[in-house]
């Protein structure tokens, strides 16, 4: 964490005197934003798949009295992939939940400072979550872990998607931090 903060501070200090951020940071922000937007726009249609799965569950269980074993796990896997892979996209579009007790009264620069400050906590949390996801995925693959249900699906596919989603959110958190730093310094990305 200290290494990451040191890198960020160095990048802030080397901001050129012109009106834009360093090319490396600008390219990083544009690249990560484009990836998260593409992934988010694809994943947002997963909610329709989840609705189909749940309607199918209702139909098979209540109408034809033939409950399917795999339906609940499939809905859980779908919603997990949906919110984790869509996390970076919701950060870009600013659609995440925010406590607006003081934030709404701040100036644009003040909001950027507040966002940069809170981004540090988010980045710290996501780094720990990312590390935990890696070790969890390694364990899952080594032990060929399955769920203890009648369907008994392997867990590694959803844990892989979780790892990718957490990584995208972490990369997007850095992108948002760089954008906030640019706002604080009145620079363009």
Predicted features and spans:
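Alpha-helical transmembrane segments and membrane-interface helix-loop junctions
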Residues: 1-189
